[in-house]
């Protein structure tokens, strides 16, 4: 069974490209252009992993990460970032992120992380 993934990014072009690439790898992909939209989706659906941009307007990745983990503690969240200091990446891991990956994301690495998230989630069930 394929991994079910939610991709959250305010850049629509990036979102579309990532969704196409993940679908081409056999994943079931949903997208959201904001953390607020993603939260509504997380409350309705169950995902193996959430891939989320760290820097977004309105609610940034840190606030979203805290909220998502409070709502769904078992949710595996992989953050994508560009130009974020290492201490911010460490903070994200401490807040419950599964991993922080530099943009542009290496698709093989991201696929491995998603498969690991799915395996972890299956263990928790």
Task: Please identify what each model-predicted range represents.
Residues 12-30:
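Two-component/phosphorelay signaling modules centered on CheY-like receiver
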Residues 31-40, 61:
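Helix N-cap/capping motif at the beta->alpha junctions
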Residues 40, 62-74:
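Short amphipathic alpha-helix used as the core "switch/output" element in two-component signaling
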Residues 45-51:
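Active-site beta3 strand of CheY-like receiver
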Residues 56:
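Receiver (REC) domain active-site loop signature in two-component systems and cognate sites
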Residues 63, 84-99:
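Alpha4 helix (beta4-alpha4-beta5 surface) of REC/receiver domains from two-component response regulators
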Residues 87, 105-115:
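C-terminal output helix
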């Amino acid at each position: 069974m394929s991994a079910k993934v939610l991709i959250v990014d305010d850049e629509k072009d990036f979102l579309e490209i990532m969704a196409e690439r993940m679908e081409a790898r056999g994943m079931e992909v949903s997208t959201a252009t904001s953390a607020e939209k993603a939260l509504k989706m997380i409350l309705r659906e169950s995902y193996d992993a959430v891939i989320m941009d760290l820097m977004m307007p309105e609610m940034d990745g840190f606030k979203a990460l805290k909220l998502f983990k409070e709502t769904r503690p078992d949710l595996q969240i992989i953050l994508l970032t560009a130009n974020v200091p290492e201490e911010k990446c460490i903070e994200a891991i401490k807040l419950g992120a599964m991993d922080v990956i530099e943009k542009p994301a290496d698709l093989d690495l991201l696929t491995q992380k998603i498969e690991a998230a799915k395996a972890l989630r299956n263990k928790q069930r």
